[in-house]
């Protein structure tokens, strides 16, 4: 089965499917899934020697204002394999901008069936402040040594904001279909 057959989720916006591109604690390599072939390409080697603090991927069949699918950071104590699909619940959003414009990233936890350790987390205020600081620090600095690239963090939004971003991105994707 190709990744193009994976939908955004069966219970949107409460649950989403996230296709993992970059595992938690991986080396500073930015991978991206080619949406047409499903192959995992090396996008670039990050100049800043930092490891991803969480699993990182996207919600298929969504489209943000930057032309990409919705980015998602999946909080888990373990790394996931690139190309794997994990069902998650959005609990917040890192609101940020970079040299290309707005670049929000949803924060999500796996559904309880996959990992019950975060079943109590429903909103961003229930996520450890330490985790939020680590994630924010990574994204604020991971482009520091790349010429012409920058990031500005605008703070964290709650689950309601994350779900609205997701709902808008699903509709934007549907609007592009013939």
From Swiss-Prot:
CDD domains xref list: pyrophosphatase
Instruction: Name the source's superkingdom.
Output: Bacteria
Q: What's an example Gene Ontology biological process for this entry?
A: phosphate-containing compound metabolic process
Which Pfam families does the record match to this protein? Pyrophosphatase
Question: What is the enzyme's class at the highest EC level?
Answer: hydrolase
Cofactor(s) of this protein: Mg(2+)
| InterPro entries with a match to the protein in the record | Pyrophosphatase, Pyrophosphatase_sf
Which of UniProt's keywords are assigned here? Cytoplasm, Hydrolase, Magnesium, Metal-binding
**According to its UniProt record, which reaction does this protein catalyse?**
diphosphate + H2O = 2 phosphate + H(+)
E.C. number: 3.6.1.1
GO CC list = cytoplasm
Main localisation, per the record?
Answer: cytoplasm
Binding residues for substrate:
30, 44, 56, 142
* Biological role: Catalyzes the hydrolysis of inorganic pyrophosphate (PPi) forming two phosphate ions.
- Family classification: Belongs to the PPase family.
Report the protein name in the record.
Answer: Inorganic pyrophosphatase
UniProt source species: Xylella fastidiosa (strain Temecula1 / ATCC 700964)
Lineage per the UniProt record: Bacteria, Pseudomonadati, Pseudomonadota, Gammaproteobacteria, Lysobacterales
């Amino acid at each position: 089965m190709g990744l193009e057959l994976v939908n955004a989720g069966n219970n949107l916006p409460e649950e989403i499917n996230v296709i993992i591109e970059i595992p938690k604690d991986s080396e500073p390599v930015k991978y991206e899934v080619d949406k047409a072939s499903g192959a995992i390409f090396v996008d670039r080697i990050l100049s800043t020697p930092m490891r991803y603090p969480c699993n990182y991927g996207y919600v298929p069949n969504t489209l943000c204002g930057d032309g990409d699918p919705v980015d998602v950071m999946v909080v888990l104590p373990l790394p996931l394999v690139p190309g794997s699909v994990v069902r998650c619940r959005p609990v917040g959003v890192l609101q940020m901008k970079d040299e290309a414009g707005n670049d929000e990233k949803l924060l999500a936890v796996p559904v309880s069936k996959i990992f019950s350790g975060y079943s109590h987390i429903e909103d961003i205020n229930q996520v450890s402040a330490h985790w939020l600081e680590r994630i924010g620090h990574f994204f604020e600095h991971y482009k520091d040594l790349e010429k012409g690239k920058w990031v500005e963090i605008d703070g964290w939004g709650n689950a309601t904001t994350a779900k609205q971003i997701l709902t808008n991105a699903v509709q934007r994707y549907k609007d592009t279909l013939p």
